């Protein structure tokens, strides 16, 4: 009886959020341990299905770095990283596309469909969904000339074809996007999944952008979770060195999404079961939320 009462309390607490998000788009970047652990995979799929059932329009953008790494190792193709990004030559690009588009994407689509959704797998090449160009990286070091790093076919997003996504949403489908883009000449690019998720969220005018990670959220210099930030305070964390490593591109894409009109961006711990529902539909949420600074 107590358990039933608790469940009822949770549903009542969630009701205002169901109303708030009904008809809205939420973009979720799916990656990390949530893509590997079987119980977390099942929970994620059910979270996405429930979003759809209560009137939310979820869009999933996924990563797949570990899967790419394993396939490159099996094929004896050497891997090189610069500034946290995989240097992508032609052979590596072929493997990236094969793994992300041909395997990981289809596994996620199948999981969602078996859980009761209508999911459709896409890459950025489908309908020129994700337009891209080669990423230019220049590293400046004190007392040294700037270093230009050639990352090969690593790209950055230049545009998103929203008509395709809107059409799928109107017909009740959940888009699942592999972070592979294409330029005007048909060249294929490997793009950081966080950056694709942020660009898609901004282009769609999403209400929320959620990035699933393997950490609790943004941490201060003492390792404590920062639950809420605005853009001004976030820029201070860039400047004082609090943000570093893999958190840098995540926060960067959050700020760009907010600038493009997304209401809130969240960095949450994908290792927590039902993390998507806990973030969106409870009073306290989890992880770190970033909002635009008050003018």
UniProtKB/Swiss-Prot annotation:
Catalyzed reaction equations: N-acetyl-L-glutamate + ATP = N-acetyl-L-glutamyl 5-phosphate + ADP
GO-annotated molecular function: acetylglutamate kinase activity; ATP binding
Keyword presence, Transport: no
Pfam families xref list: AA_kinase (PF00696)
Entry EC no(s): 2.7.2.8
Annotated InterPro entries: AceGlu_kinase-like_sf, AcgluKinase_fam, ArgB, Asp/Glu/Uridylate_kinase, Glu/AcGlu_kinase, NAGK-C
Biological process, per Gene Ontology: arginine biosynthetic process via ornithine; L-arginine biosynthetic process
Pathway recorded for this protein: Amino-acid biosynthesis; L-arginine biosynthesis; N(2)-acetyl-L-ornithine from L-glutamate: step 2/4
Source organism superkingdom: Bacteria
GO cellular component: cytoplasm
Primary localisation category: cytoplasm
Gene3D superfamilies in the cross-refs: Acetylglutamate kinase-like
Site entry: Transition state stabilizer: 29, 250
Keyword tags: Amino-acid biosynthesis, Arginine biosynthesis, ATP-binding, Cytoplasm, Kinase, Nucleotide-binding, Transferase
Ranges in coiled-coil conformation: none
Annotated substrate binding sites: 64-65, 86, 190
Location of this chain's protein in the cell: Cytoplasm
PANTHER family registered for this protein in UniProt: N-ACETYLGLUTAMATE SYNTHASE (PTHR23342), N-ACETYLGLUTAMATE SYNTHASE, MITOCHONDRIAL (PTHR23342:SF0)
Stated role: Catalyzes the ATP-dependent phosphorylation of N-acetyl-L-glutamate.
UniProt-listed HAMAP family: ArgB (MF_00082)
NCBIfam families given in the database record: argB
Family: Belongs to the acetylglutamate kinase family. ArgB subfamily.
Protein name: Acetylglutamate kinase
Gene: argB
